């Protein structure tokens, strides 16, 4: 694609519209290099990627990426055997963390079929060992002491020496404070010094490092700490050497994987760009257009992307048309319509969504040429006409049948009669070569050309003669007219003068009357089309509302069914409990054999129905109505499915219940009574039966990887509550390493929870700092 069309249509400004939605430097770089292409398979691939990302957003509306830096230069440095510094390793650390998050997200992705993006997700390479090694590089920009034994030993020595220096200096401050200009320890040339009054400089022996501007204060390093400071300086040098050795070791570890990590970064940036395109679509109403097999263009409600509140227009440039000629006066929006077509094509061929409605269709052109605006060259001393004609000559030499040509004010800048003749000749040459062309002109002669010539259609921009303002609405099939007589009369010119002017142009008046009738017919057709679209929109709204009601009905139905199942299970549990009590009594008071007891128990279990319709059980309904809860009753909390005991009734009618390790305040409708009062139970014979052991324990692990922060905190809160209700002693929380946001949120939550006895990271072989083990009180 020639670069001149990109400058003419301000394609760089189009790309700037997508920049705010990008999160990664790699995505910004890819956007900056984005250019239109004539390769259909490339455009199709970009369109499918956007469709895939739209599906992801349906299931995960808040899908996002963490910010990453461009690592192209540093991966090349690795390949060239150079060593990386701490900041560069932090950039690698972030890329590996985002890679892990994306991989986990993709593995957990459900109900989404991806046609193109699946290949990108699959190609992400995860390096757990490399990520583990980078734990030694702290996000604050320093190497952790545990990176090596030598570094840990050196830093301990520095700490010890610094403590000794601090103690000695504090002692001097305490004992010789009157000799000091200030009761603080200062620093000069990297050494700890004391601000000594000049009159006492000989009373404190040591090394003078500085003197104040006034000369009243001398900064002295006491001799008692000189040797210690020398040791600290030496240890600092050892520390720097050891850090450099660690960085070299890490560089050697990463070097074999530089290409794969660079590819990860590219995939992250590309996914970021695709995500930005879809976010742009969500914010602006842009769409992914259909792609025509031939040069068949249909743009529905298309808008100019760089004009705020631009008027939407329909444009049909199908296979039955080679040229569209937009006629009419200036300032009506002809040039904007010309640019809108060009931008829609360039954006689509760059793999970007276009500002139009669904059902829009674009073609694929090998080149797009344009002569738009006044490109007069002062240096070449060319007139407006010469400038345009030079450009048009160049276009005619380069175009072929796969090109799209946009010509603004064709033939302008010279004698009107000659200019019109040239314009018709140029258009005819392009038509015979079957080159798609849209041209604007104010010459009336081209109206007749549009009417009389095959494969050519007239068009114009609507003008409101009442307000004397253009409406910027595109009227395809209707040639433009000047409206000069109507405008002059409305502005106050006498009817006599206007009438005399009309007599001078009888033929033109007839043509204008025909055009006026065509305009009226077009407006009527447009009104009908608008009405049809309004009905379609109402139908869509109705269908969406109906679908919403249907889904709500199904959810409520499922909720009621679940509630009924819980109540039914309560009855079943009660029956089984009573049956075990009966069998226990029988076992104590009879000589039944064990296998006979088991058979009897199995038969009793069969008495429990698979489902119980409580709504039709009048006896149970009456029994529940007659019996009120009281302190000491066993209950089932319906929202949690957990058993508890009523402790006391509050003044407002609510109940306080002990459920596991926590106390809860419940409304009466939030729990069900489990057992009848003992005095209401009939006396039964006792049989001893061995109870079944429940081997299915509650879930003791929570995986928060790939979750949003708010979603993760909600799941964590519910999980801890459930663990406490089940009297669990210990649970594991997997949060991953990533950006550290979720890990920090988990830590803050656990610190605030009064039921947590202790918590800490898992052993290295069980997840390390990517998992937290929680022990309850």
Curated annotation (Swiss-Prot):
SMART domains hit by this protein: MUTSac, MUTSd, SMR
Keywords attached to this entry: ATP-binding, DNA-binding, Endonuclease, Hydrolase, Nuclease, Nucleotide-binding, RNA-binding, rRNA-binding
Root EC class: hydrolase
Pfam families: MSSS (PF20297), MutS_V (PF00488), Smr (PF01713)
Limits of the Smr domain: 702-777
Binding site for ATP: 328-335
One GO MF term attached to the UniProt entry: ATP-dependent DNA damage sensor activity
Classification via CDD domains: ABC_MutS2 (cd03280)
Family: Belongs to the DNA mismatch repair MutS family. MutS2 subfamily.
Protein name (database record): Endonuclease MutS2
Organism the protein comes from: Streptococcus sanguinis (strain SK36)
Lineage: Bacteria, Bacillati, Bacillota, Bacilli, Lactobacillales
Gene: mutS2
